[in-house]
Amino acid sequence: CKKWEKLGYRPDAVVLEGPLAGGHLGFRIDDVELESNKLENLFPSVKDMAMKYGDIPVIVAGGIYTHEDIVHYQNMGAAGVQMGTRFLATEESSASESFKQAVVAAKDEDIVVAHRPGSPCGLPFRVIKQSPMYVSSLKQLRKPKCDKGYVLQRDADGKYTVCGAKESNENFFCICNGLLSSGGYNTDKEEALYTVGTNASHVDRILSVKELMQELSGT
């Protein structure tokens, strides 16, 4: 906030994502399950800081699943919630049909935090362990090829040329192509990578967005 304040800008909102989210997690692998990092424990200090800068709205994310969850965080002072997995499993979602069905089939033990091998970004990465690309990565069946370049790191000259998967394939695997495939792109060329939040195991059917919104609003 201080940086943007100096430039004359004020954030429209801040999104606080807890460790139950899908995909990349902003925590060290050893800190993902700490009690202190639970969303409800992180929220108060973030809300207090947002208040100091003019009551910037705080939106919470990661593990929000029910109407009761939404009400709980609204009562704590959240301006809103951000939800991914629940809307992924809707009729209108652009996710591939195989992705949606993988979510419906997923059990608690099927949802894991990938780390070694993991994302070339170096962050813990929550995924369905049966994801075709993840299975291949564990067996190092897919040779890394960085033809998208979305998560390249800087080299000694400050240019984005370093691919973690190419540099250390035993520790990292390509994710860009797999994520695109899970969204229905290049499915004939690339295996899919299914990222979900921990509560994906509760999804038992594909809903319409209208049905989901009625459920989430408590109507």
Question: Locations of the language-model features?
Answer:
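Conserved active-site-proximal phosphate/metal-binding subdomains
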Residues: 2, 19-59, 65-219
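Non-cysteine beta-strand/loop elements that form the S-adenosyl-L-methionine
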Residues: 12-20
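Residue-level recognition of the N-termini of beta-strands and the immediately preceding loop/turn
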Residues: 11-12, 56
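Active-site-proximal beta-alpha core segment in soluble small-molecule metabolic enzymes
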Residues: 1-9
